[in-house]
Amino acid sequence: MTHYHFVGIKGSGMSSLAQIMHDLGHEVQGSDIESYVFTEVALRNKGIKILPFDANNITKEMVVIQGNAFPDNHEEIVRAHELKLDIIKYHDFLGHVINQYTSVAVTGAHGKTSTTGLLSHVMNGDKKTSFLIGDGTGMGLPGSDYFAFEACEYRRHFLSYHPDYAIMTNIDFDHPDYFKNIDDVYDAFQHMALNVKKGIIAWGDDEYLRKLDVDIPVYYYGFKETDDIYAKNIQITEKGTQFDVYIKGEFYDQFLSPQYGNHNILNALAVIAISYLEDMNVENIKEALITFGGVKRRFNETKVSNQVIVDDYAHHPREISATIETARKKYPQKDVVAVFQPHTFSRTQAFLNEFAESLSKADQVFLCEIFGSIRENTGDLTIEDLINRIDGSTLIDENSIDVLEKFDNAVILFMGAGDIQKLLKAYFEKLGVKNDF
C-alpha cells in the first residue's frame, strides 16, 4: 500500500484519480483551497482527508501527485523536494495507471466528460471497467479489464497517454491562453493520435479529424451513410431519443437513450462503436444506455413548480449552443433563460462575438462577472463588453437572483466552469429547495 498526497485534490481530474487510488486500497489524502468545490462531496463520502495547503502536510514516505495548476514553487512541492520524495505530475501518473488495462481515452474540445461518463456506465453493463471522469468522479474496480478516462488536450497533457483506443469527439479552438490557433490544436491531436495502439473513433463531420494521419484504423461516426457507424430513423419521445445504428452500411440494432440533442446521439454512437469493436454483448449495451443518468454539471435538472433549473458546465460557445438545443428539444413548450458566467478573460476575449451569438439563442440572458482562473485573474475587458453585444441581457448576482422567479414556465440554465454554483445555490435557497451538489 502506498501513501499518496494530492496537491490540488479538488481539481476535477485530481479528485477522480484520488478516488481511484483509494478504491484500489492505497492510503490517500490531499490539499486544496478551503472554499467549497463540488468535487469534494465524493471525496468526503469515501473518507478521503482534505487539508488546507500547508508544507507540514508533506511527510516522509509519501508519493506526491502534483496538480497541473500548481507550480514547482508551491510550498508543498518545495517540501516534497526537500524530503526527496517522488513527485509525479497528474497526467504522468494517470498515464502510468492506464497501462494496466485495456484503456479507452476520450478527448476532444467538447463533450469529453459526458462521453466518458456514458462510456464508463455502458461498458460496466457488460465488462468490469474502472473510470476517471472530468466531473470529479472516479472509481477503481479491483479486477477490472478496462479503464475509461477523460484526456484533456490543454498544454498537450494528453500526450502522456498511450491508450488502446481513443474517442475523439471534435477539434475546436479553445484554451487561447495556450494554443495559438486551430492548426496548433490539430497538431496536438495528431500527435495524440500517434500514441493510440488499436483504433480511433472520431466524429465524421469534423474536417480536422478527417485529416488524421495514422497507421491504425480510424472509425468515423455521425449521421451520414458515408460514416463507418451512423444513426438513422431518429425519433424523439417522452422516454428520450430512439435511433437505429448502422455499422459499415449494415443495420446493427435499435437503441434508446434517455437524453436529448444531436450531440448526445453522437456520444452514444462513439460508445457503441467501442462496445462493438470489443465484442461486447449488444443487449447489455442497450440496457445500460437506457439507464444512464448523466454526469455531474451536465444538464443536471431540478424541477420546481413550472421551472426546470439546470446546472451545466458549458463554458464555450458551442457547448452553450448544445445546452440550449437540449433544453429546446426536451421542453419545447417552455422559454429558455440563460444565466452564464464567462470563464477566464482570455477565453472571453477570444470568443466574445461567438458567446453573444450562442447566448442569443435563449429567450432571456443574464450574465455574471467574468471568473478568472488560478493562472489568470485579470484582463482588459469586462462583462459589459458581452452585455453590449446581447440585446436585452443584464447583469445578475446573488443579491438580484430573485428576478428569475418571474419566469414561470421556463428552463433556467445556469452555465459556466467557474463558481456559477454560488448563484444556483442562492436561487435554491430563495425557493426553499435543498440541493446537494
From Swiss-Prot:
Function: Cell wall formation.
EC code: 6.3.2.8
Coarse class of the protein's main subcellular location: cytoplasm
UniProt keywords, alphabetically: ATP-binding, Cell cycle, Cell division, Cell shape, Cell wall biogenesis/degradation, Cytoplasm, Ligase, Nucleotide-binding, Peptidoglycan synthesis
Pathway annotation: Cell wall biogenesis; peptidoglycan biosynthesis
Example of a GO MF term: ATP binding
Family: Belongs to the MurCDEF family.
A cellular component term, taken from the record's GO annotations: cytoplasm
Record's protein name: UDP-N-acetylmuramate--L-alanine ligase
Gene3D superfamilies listed in its UniProt record: Mur ligase, C-terminal domain (3.90.190.20), Mur-like, catalytic domain (3.40.1190.10), NAD(P)-binding Rossmann-like Domain (3.40.50.720)
Pfam entry (one): Mur_ligase_M
SUPFAM superfamilies with a match to the protein in the record: MurCD N-terminal domain, MurD-like peptide ligases, catalytic domain, MurD-like peptide ligases, peptide-binding domain
Residue positions binding ATP: G108, A109, H110, G111, K112, T113, S114
Catalytic activity: UDP-N-acetyl-alpha-D-muramate + L-alanine + ATP = UDP-N-acetyl-alpha-D-muramoyl-L-alanine + ADP + phosphate + H(+)
Database matches in NCBIfam families: murC
Location relative to the cell: Cytoplasm
Keyword Cytoplasm in record: yes
A single GO BP: cell division
